[in-house]
Amino acid sequence: MENLYHQIAGSNFMIAFAGADGILLDTITDQSFGDTAAASSIRPGTIWTEASCGTNALGTVAHTGTPLMVHGAEHFFAQHGALTCIAAPVFDAQGVLAGVLDASSDCRSRQQHTRALVSMAATQIESGLFRECHRSEVLIVLHSRPEYLHPQRWSSGR
């Protein structure tokens, strides 16, 4: 979450992580976004399932397990109509949904690269879960681009 936040910090965003059950567990918020009325309803402990909030990125991704963007009036409740929310699923080492990573902002903020950044961050979390699950085993890591291989991080369990 922190890596994603630092990539988009200062651009009026909130990063959020919810469990597979749609309950918001943690957020990191730009001050500019945190001061908005919309941000006041996005806080740890709130429930974002489709059953309780209608169409929203966190709840819909928790339900479908696929990445999604919900923009403005696509939200079920009008109170969230000024937001754009981009979410991606996070799966554990066994392929079970572990949670949902989300980046939310007001609809006027630039969204050009956010989808890719959220998906990449979700993949990084999944890699960490996989490494943790298999930390007592020898892992062989292959990639066509060497800059994506970080043996020191893999072997230290980070």
Model regions and ranges:
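Intrinsically disordered, low-complexity terminal regulatory regions
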Residues: 1-49, 60-69, 82, 91-157
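Phosphate/pyrophosphate-binding betaalpha-module
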Residues: 50-54
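Short, solvent-exposed loop/turn elements at beta->coil junctions and helix N-caps
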Residues: 73-77, 144-145
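Helix-to-coil/beta transition segments that act as allosteric "coupling" elements at the rims
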Residues: 75-91
